[in-house]
Structures are given as C-alpha cells and as structure tokens.
Amino acid sequence: MSARPQNVGIKAIEVYFPSQCVDQAELEKFDGVSEGKYTIGLGQTKMSFCDDREDIYSIALTTCSSLLRKYNIDPKSIGRLEVGTETLLDKSKSVKSVLMQLFAPHGNTNIEGVDTVNACYGGTNAVFNSINWVESSAWDGRDAIVVCGDIALYAKGAARPTGGAGAVAMLIGPDAPIVFEPGLRGSYVTHAYDFFKPDLTSEYPVVDGHFSLKCYTEAVDACYKAYAAREKVLKAKVQNGTNGVENDETKTPLDRFDYVLFHAPTCKLVQKSYGRMLYNDYLANPSHPAFAEVPSELRDLDYEKSFTDKTVEKTFMGLTKKTFAERVRPGLDVATLCGNMYTATVYAGLASLLSNVTFDPSQPKRVALFSYGSGLASSMFSVKIVGDVSGMVEKLDLHKRLNARTVLPPQTYDEMCILREHAHLKKNFKPTGNPDTLFPGTYYLTEIDDMFRRKYEIKA
C-alpha cells in the first residue's frame, strides 16, 4: 500500500462574479438613507447582481468550466465533485448533477459527491468532505473539486444592500501549495431561527437581523475556543509531555495567525469580529501585557451583555485597528466590491488575499478561516501557504476583472430584482435579460420548458 497523501489542500482556485454591479453610495441616495449608512456603516462599496439570464446552475457551470480551462485540468482526473449552495432551484435534483455535463462527455461519470446545504456554510462542509475523502481509504488517487456559490437577494428594505452574487471553484488534492492544517478545526452548530428560507415561492429569506448578528458573534467566540482547545490537544501529542513552546510575552494568541479570513455578511461585521477574537484572548488571560489599557470592569462583564456592550466593541476594535489593516483587510476586496456571495464568501476572501499579498514559499504563512451559515453551523480552521501561488494569482486576474464590470444605476438594480421575481418558479419561460452584457465564457439561461427543464448557452 502506498503512503497516505500529504499536504492536502487547495491546488487551484477560480472566482466568478457577474458583469454588473451597483454602487452602494448611489444606492444610499436611491433608498433615501443617510450618507455612509451602507458604505461606512456596513463597509460595502459595490454589490454584484444578475438578471433572469443567470441562476445557480449557470453560475456553477461558468465557474467550474473556467477552473478546468484556466488550469488545464483533465476532467478524467476528478474523482469527487461537491457543491455548496443555498440557492435552490429544485427540491430533489442537485446542482452537482448539472455540472456533470462538464465531465460525462469526457467519459468520466465515476465522480462522488452531491450538494451540501446550510445557508452560507455549505461550501465549507463541501471542502471538509473533499479533504476527508482525499485523506480516507475511499480515495482513488484523483483530485476533488468544490464549487460554492449563491445569488444573495433580499426584499426591499434594510437588508437589501447586503446582497451579492458569485461563486468560487477549488481543486483539492495532495501536494498543494495551500495546505489545510491536519486536525485543526473547531465547530459550533446549534438551532437558531436567525435567517432561513421557509417560503419556497420566493427567493427572499426571512431574517431576524439583530439576532443573526448575535448568532454570528457567538459562533466566532465558540469556534475560536474550540479551535484553541483542539490545537492544545494536538500540540500536547506532538510534544509528548515536554514543554517545547517558546512564548513571546508581547504576542497574544491571535498573533499566531498571519492572516484571518471571515465569512463576510458585511465588512463592518468582519472588523468587529476580528476585535472579538482578541476579546476572547483577553478573557482567557486579562493580565497579558497587551491588555494593560483595557478597562478592568470588562473582565467581569456578563457574557450576554458583551454582545451589545459598546466599550467592549470599541476597545478591541481599537486594539486591533493596525493588525486588521495588515491581516484581515487584504482578504476583503471581493466582499466589499461584490457583496455577500453566501457559501463562496470566505473562499473569495482567500482569492482576495492571494491577489493582494506576495507570498514567498520559503516563508510559509498561516491563515485562519471562519465560516458561518445561519440556522446555524460554523467552523474555524487554518491553512498554511507553503508553495508557489503566483500561478493562481495570474489566473485569477482579480483586480482587472473587478474593474472590468459595468456599474449600473440603482433603478436598474431594482428592475433586475423585479425581473427575477417574475422568473421565479416559472415554466414555459424565456428570460428577457440581455446576454450581451455578460462576460465571455459565461453560461446563461435561454429557456425553461413545460417540464421545468432548463437550457443554457455560452456567451462567445
């Protein structure tokens, strides 16, 4: 039996976002809200959207086909394909089965995996399943692909500017330049009605906004603690009881991560959450020199009150202001310029990070990732960037592609939302959106027949 695969992780990555977006400052004016409510209050600059020509099938096909093409991946070399999404078109048929159109013509139908659904967390579950598959006795030597993506839409009102659209596809296998740290995961899963989609006649969710923010913050706390506990166990095993840890007195546990990526419902929430991680470090060790200026009354603050306490928020956002700019902000380009891609958001954050920072394989960097899906399921895990990622950066061509989009007025965005409302659940339907607006290589819907079967073409 050959040795087990080593350095399992991400070998290739592709991001897709629609060709059209709306400017959040213009949206503020259009919605009649105060200046800065979306751009400063939420930390959002632009928001991606699509008309009735794109759906989850087309977006997944576009992203997966682009990954295969750009990285010259042989479709026969894939043994697992899994999709994470919460944008459902069918209560039975998976998005993964639709993607088999990219593999079956090459004679490859022996591919494991289906769809994983839990709000914005499905992509991470698909990644975990794929990593587990490569590390398992079921692995047949081939690579896995994970596709995660969504169209995030909200009914008119306070939540609408937190929408977005896009997808990420990743090639996962051994000997990767971005390696998942084995065994280092902490999760928090519980029952909560913070954001859910019980009305299948609508694309819009039911949202309890304030409660959802609290759930997200609780999940950050719990996952960070669970990750630290797991790390402690693994370190103890490696050291076999000896104390081989060198402690730098000036550093906090948060400093063990060179970069941190978050699921980003809004970029402002990410900034608060990074500060929240340091608050957890403070509670674990209030006498650490880094916390000399922290008001002592915060040490004994009731946990429930900590979610709404402005002193906690301001203190730890202040203490992390510099490190946030260095370690978190580089991963937020797609989130601030496209909005929330739901399942794809944290992985689009990885694409942003790769595109903004030059990584040297001789100096591996450690990146923490926090993934959250309402309802709720969440995890914190970490990767090490150990290899050459310059080829990924070149193929992503992220900034050039972001700048190539068309910014449309809020009125048009509103009309597109209405267009999608009319298209929802229709059969015998021909979309009316203009395919000429799409980027070349984009799959788009041409018709839905009388049995709800969908047909697509590719923009030349």
From Swiss-Prot:
Annotated active site residues, numbered on this chain, are E86, C120, H263
The entry lists its GO molecular-function terms as: hydroxymethylglutaryl-CoA synthase activity
This enzyme catalyses: acetoacetyl-CoA + acetyl-CoA + H2O = (3S)-3-hydroxy-3-methylglutaryl-CoA + CoA + H(+)
Xref: InterPro entries: HMG_CoA_synt_AS (IPR000590), HMG_CoA_synt_C_dom (IPR013746), HMG_CoA_synth_N (IPR013528), HMG_CoA_synthase_euk (IPR010122), Thiolase-like (IPR016039)
Biological process GO terms, please? acetyl-CoA metabolic process; ergosterol biosynthetic process; farnesyl diphosphate biosynthetic process, mevalonate pathway
Q: Is the keyword Protein biosynthesis in the record?
A: no
Pathway, according to UniProt? Metabolic intermediate biosynthesis; (R)-mevalonate biosynthesis; (R)-mevalonate from acetyl-CoA: step 2/3
- Regions annotated as coiled coil: none
PROSITE patterns per the UniProt record, alphabetical: HMG_COA_SYNTHASE (PS01226)
Keywords, sorted A to Z? Acyltransferase, Lipid biosynthesis, Lipid metabolism, Steroid biosynthesis, Steroid metabolism, Sterol biosynthesis, Sterol metabolism, Transferase
Top-level taxon of the source organism:
Eukaryota
EC numbers, comma separated:
2.3.3.10
| Sites where the protein binds (3S)-3-hydroxy-3-methylglutaryl-CoA | C120, T162, S212, H263, K272, N340, S374
Pfam annotation, one family = HMG_CoA_synt_C
Its function, per the record, reads: Hydroxymethylglutaryl-CoA synthase; part of the first module of ergosterol biosynthesis pathway that includes the early steps of the pathway, conserved across all eukaryotes, and which results in the formation of mevalonate from acetyl-coenzyme A (acetyl-CoA). Erg13A and erg13B condense acetyl-CoA with acetoacetyl-CoA to form hydroxymethylglutaryl-CoA (HMG-CoA). The first module starts with the action of the cytosolic acetyl-CoA acetyltransferase erg10B that catalyzes the formation of acetoacetyl-CoA.
- Similarity comment: Belongs to the thiolase-like superfamily. HMG-CoA synthase family.
The UniProt entry, under PANTHER family, shows:
3-HYDROXY-3-METHYLGLUTARYL COENZYME A SYNTHASE, HYDROXYMETHYLGLUTARYL-COA SYNTHASE
- The protein depicted here goes by the name Hydroxymethylglutaryl-CoA synthase erg13B
- Organism expressing this protein natively: Aspergillus fumigatus (strain ATCC MYA-4609 / CBS 101355 / FGSC A1100 / Af293)
Lineage here is:
Eukaryota, Fungi, Dikarya, Ascomycota, Pezizomycotina
